[in-house]
């Protein structure tokens, strides 16, 4: 078998001379920090979305034609509904595995959006968007917005009461746009709301157009990551010109494949054990049945919250009236613009035009970190405001009061979050500098000859002639704060949950770790030697 594979490989290489290029690519090194797996959750969620979506398209009809339901769900028998809602019910109750696949599709959509958001937060707070990766930041923003549009269209397709209310709100916001509102509404909905072409257009966009664009952007995103090399956190042996981690074969490919299977398993468990978007409890869309308690999915809830807390300000220009819903669209547009343009805004203010492959700790960039926390607080306040009617109902308070709580909170809390975060970052910086200057606190108290009590510190570097630690420069890497971080606590034992490894196996592990340590030390010495040679520093 191996000879046959070798023969096939030789035949391919003789025609395309791909061996040398493939060898270089499979030797690519990936960092091992856990936060780099956040983007992979989004990737695997999108793959699951494609697979489950293909299955759902086999049984779903997006027609808005009215029919009388006569199916497995008895409470709705004899009720007039659209063909789209009927096929969604049939898919849930009569197609084998249909409900499981539909719920897995919905959970994967939520996971896709949440993982993309958290992934972008990691990129923002660590400065991974800086030059030369501005293009990837823009691609990520476009992916986030396309994911929101794709999800909104997806849960609008069943034509249930909740999705219909969401579409009606979106229709009103689009119509409130000056000049282009009417034309944009016609382009999206195909006429007045609801129109006969509405779901057909959503279906084409949801199944063909937007997934194709997302797939192309993901490919471009991964290609840029591969070509520009991966960022990494500062640490021993890590520079702007190298990457420390594991090779793609065999370690990384095994880790990422296992992580993909875990993602698939978690989504399958969620789909099988928890119910989501139970459209049979909502009934078909009926404009006369619109009520409170109508919230979209979590990634769109902030837009609903903006519509709820925005004052009803109407703008009159001559004989034209701009409705209050326009300000909601304007606010969303401003937030989107700030998100996309932030790398260029920061570059303009700081004047930083250098290439960056090493990441930053959030505490080292307090202004950016504080702005990020401020934006997160603003987003969560809008999200909570999207459910202000539920808060008012369950806590028996005035809905008007809850609306004003959201308005005042949006003005007061984000600046407060900025101030608190900024002070926390400065405090963490002082904590790092204190350890670098004085050493790690040991908890040992020593009595001086004059009767004073002082705490003994463990220096991180050399000491002067008086025994005082020599202050060390901060290199952007985590600073050890406890003696266990330096290995004083020893290493944990090896073995299973209940039994340790035997002595011979433990000795073998220790020997391997010692060899790896010697190899790592030799690598660091060679790296230091090469760096000094490049800088023109002579060896001692």
Swiss-Prot record:
Q: What's the protein here called?
A: Cytochrome bc1 complex cytochrome b subunit
Q: Where in the cell is it found?
A: Cell membrane
What Gene Ontology biological process does one annotation of this record name? respiratory electron transport chain
Record-level Gene Ontology MF annotations: metal ion binding; ubiquinol-cytochrome-c reductase activity
From the UniProt record, list the reaction(s) this protein catalyses: a quinol + 2 Fe(III)-[cytochrome c](out) = a quinone + 2 Fe(II)-[cytochrome c](out) + 2 H(+)(out)
Q: Give the EC number(s) listed in the UniProt record.
A: 7.1.1.8
Q: Which Pfam families match?
A: Cytochrom_B_N_2
């Amino acid at each position: 078998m191996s000879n046959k594979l070798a023969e096939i490989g030789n035949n391919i290489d003789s025609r395309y001379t791909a061996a040398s290029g493939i060898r270089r690519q499979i030797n690519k090194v990936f960092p091992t920090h856990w936060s780099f797996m956040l983007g992979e959750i989004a990737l695997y969620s999108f793959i699951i979305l494609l697979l489950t979506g293909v299955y759902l398209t086999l049984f779903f009809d997006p027609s808005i034609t009215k029919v009388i339901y006569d199916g497995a769900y008895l409470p709705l028998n004899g009720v007039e509904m659209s063909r789209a809602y009927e096929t969604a019910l049939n898919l849930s109750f009569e197609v084998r595995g249909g409900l499981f696949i539909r719920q897995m599709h919905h959970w994967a959509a939520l996971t896709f959006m949440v993982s993309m958001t958290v992934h972008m937060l990691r990129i923002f707070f660590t400065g991974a968007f800086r030059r030369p990766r501005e293009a990837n930041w823009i691609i990520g923003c476009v992916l986030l917005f396309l994911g929101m549009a794709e999800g909104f269209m997806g849960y609008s397709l069943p034509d249930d009461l909740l999705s219909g209310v969401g579409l009606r709100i979106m229709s009103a916001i689009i119509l409130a746009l000056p000049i282009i509102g009417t034309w944009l509404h016609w382009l999206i909905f195909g006429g007045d709301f609801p129109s006969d072409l509405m779901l057909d257009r959503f279906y084409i966009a949801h199944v063909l157009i937007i997934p194709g664009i997302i797939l192309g952007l993901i490919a471009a995103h991964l290609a840029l990551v591969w070509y520009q090399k991966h960022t990494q956190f500062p640490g021993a042996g890590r520079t702007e010109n190298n990457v420390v981690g594991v090779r793609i074969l065999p370690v990384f490919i095994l880790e990422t494949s296992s992580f993909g299977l875990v993602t698939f398993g978690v989504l399958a468990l969620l789909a099988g054990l928890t119910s989501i978007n139970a459209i049979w409890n909502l009934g078909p869309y009926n404009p006369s049945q619109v009520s409170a308690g109508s919230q979209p999915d979590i990634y769109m809830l902030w837009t609903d919250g903006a519509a709820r807390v925005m004052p009803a300000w109407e703008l009159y220009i001559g004989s034209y009236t701009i409705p209050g819903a326009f300000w909601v669209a304007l606010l969303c547009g401003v937030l989107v613009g700030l998100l996309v343009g932030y790398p260029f805004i920061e570059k303009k203010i700081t004047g930083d035009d250098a290439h960056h492959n090493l990441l930053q700790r959030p505490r080292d960039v307090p202004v950016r970190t504080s702005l990020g926390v401020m934006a997160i607080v603003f987003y969560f306040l809008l999200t909570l405001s999207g459910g202000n009617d539920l808060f008012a109902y369950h806590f028996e308070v005035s809905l008007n009061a809850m609306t004003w709580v959201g308005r005042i909170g949006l003005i007061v809390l984000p600046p407060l979050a900025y101030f608190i975060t900024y002070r926390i970052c400065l405090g963490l910086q002082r904590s790092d500098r204190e350890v670098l200057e004085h050493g790690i606190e040991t908890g040992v108290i020593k009595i001086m000859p004059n009767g004073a009590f002082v705490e003994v510190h463990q220096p991180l570097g050399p000491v002067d002639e008086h025994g005082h630690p020599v202050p060390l420069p901060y290199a952007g890497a985590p600073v050890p704060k406890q003696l266990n971080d330096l290995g004083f606590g020893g290493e944990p034992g090896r073995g299973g949950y209940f039994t340790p490894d035997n002595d011979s196996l433990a000795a073998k592990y220790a020997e391997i770790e010692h060899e790896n340590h010697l190899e790592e030390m030799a690598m660091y010495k060679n790296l230091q030697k090469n760096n000094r040679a490049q800088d023109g520093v002579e060896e001692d």
